[in-house]
């Protein structure tokens, strides 16, 4: 029987929407939190709002625009080109401190609404080199949050060891593959659904979908 409550860190993208469906299957009550950190595309927040409303999930939007002032990057500035990391450098889309701050504020919100679980869609398999998507970081932060608030939060990372094809498969298991494909925004250029097809996020998303659909046809 479902008994516990969870808060889902929710961007309106493929991964966090899949996590939303994952959480709906596991917890008696869930709420979602989206962070406005000055993203290039306001549409990202609107997507999150629409999905949460359609699924009947209480949705919080927190102002984190200070992050844009501290750490300019390709996700928040039109004049910074979206580029993969070269020669060991981080991609231009990396936002220093983003997951640290988002999960910390999600922890504060969780303590206020009585949620034990904090769900996030970070993934080490297809993590694009972001250090704050690693399992070791999440485990460390989980300990820190509990010590800082004298609580017993559990940070759940259902996608941590899944590649993009497996993430599509997980959405399909919940009967949500088409929902995730048509309603979510992953594209760095702000194009909903299958996206622009050119940016790194769209290429990774399409590659995973093609792999999964090819695999599914065989069975």
From Swiss-Prot:
<feature type="binding site">
    <location>
        <position position="202"/>
    </location>
    <ligand>
        <name>Zn(2+)</name>
    </ligand>
</feature>
<protein>
    <recommendedName>
        <fullName>7-cyano-7-deazaguanine synthase</fullName>
        <ecNumber>6.3.4.20</ecNumber>
    </recommendedName>
</protein>
<comment type="similarity">
    <text>Belongs to the QueC family.</text>
</comment>
<dbReference type="Pfam" id="PF06508">
    <property type="entry name" value="QueC"/>
</dbReference>
<dbReference type="InterPro" id="IPR014729">
    <property type="entry name" value="Rossmann-like_a/b/a_fold"/>
</dbReference>
<comment type="pathway">
    <text>Purine metabolism; 7-cyano-7-deazaguanine biosynthesis.</text>
</comment>
<dbReference type="GO" id="GO:0008270">
    <property type="term" value="F:zinc ion binding"/>
</dbReference>
<dbReference type="GO" id="GO:0016879">
    <property type="term" value="F:ligase activity, forming carbon-nitrogen bonds"/>
</dbReference>
<feature type="binding site">
    <location>
        <position position="187"/>
    </location>
    <ligand>
        <name>Zn(2+)</name>
    </ligand>
</feature>
<keyword id="KW-0436">Ligase</keyword>
<keyword id="KW-0067">ATP-binding</keyword>
<dbReference type="GO" id="GO:0008616">
    <property type="term" value="P:queuosine biosynthetic process"/>
</dbReference>
<keyword id="KW-0547">Nucleotide-binding</keyword>
<comment type="function">
    <text>Catalyzes the ATP-dependent conversion of 7-carboxy-7-deazaguanine (CDG) to 7-cyano-7-deazaguanine (preQ(0)).</text>
</comment>
<dbReference type="GO" id="GO:0005524">
    <property type="term" value="F:ATP binding"/>
</dbReference>
<comment type="subunit">
    <text>Homodimer.</text>
</comment>
<keyword id="KW-0862">Zinc</keyword>
<keyword id="KW-0671">Queuosine biosynthesis</keyword>
<feature type="binding site">
    <location>
        <position position="196"/>
    </location>
    <ligand>
        <name>Zn(2+)</name>
    </ligand>
</feature>
<keyword id="KW-0479">Metal-binding</keyword>
<dbReference type="InterPro" id="IPR018317">
    <property type="entry name" value="QueC"/>
</dbReference>
<feature type="binding site">
    <location>
        <begin position="10"/>
        <end position="20"/>
    </location>
    <ligand>
        <name>ATP</name>
    </ligand>
</feature>
<feature type="binding site">
    <location>
        <position position="199"/>
    </location>
    <ligand>
        <name>Zn(2+)</name>
    </ligand>
</feature>
